[in-house]
Amino acid sequence: QLLTAEQTGWDWFSLHLNDGRKLMAYRLRGGGEDGGDYLFTHLMDARGTTQQRGTDGVVLTPLEIQRVARRDIPTTWQLTLPDAGLDLTIEARHPNRWMPTTVPYWEGDVTVRDTATQEALGVGYLEMTGYEVND
C-alpha cells in the first residue's frame, strides 16, 4: 500500500452534483495532526472556479457499515461542508464491490442526496482502501 506507517487507508470520493458543481473529497485514515485523520476537499463550481478546503468545518462520517468480503465496509456516508451549504448523504449503489487485488480495495458508483430532504443531488464514485479482514 502506498501509505506511511501511521496511515491505515483512504476513502476517496468524486461527486458530480446536479447543479454543475463537482466535489472531490478524501480522507487519509491516520497520520494527520495528533495522529488523527487527514481530510481534504476540492469543490469546483459550474463555471470551473475551484475552492480547496482542509479539515476546517468539513465533516465526513460513516453512517452505515456492511459486511463485505469479511470486512466491515462503510457503504453510506455523510459529508458536510458548511461553507458551501452542503450536507450530503452518499450511498453505494452496489455495496459488494470489494476488489481482492495486490492492494485490495472497494470501489463503486454512489448516489448523492441532501441529508435533510433526501432530494437526489447527484452521482459519483467512491474508492476505499485499508479495510482489513475482521473475523
Label each region the model flagged.
Residues 1-135:
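Structured soluble/peripheral alpha/beta segments that form catalytic or ligand/cofactor-binding pockets
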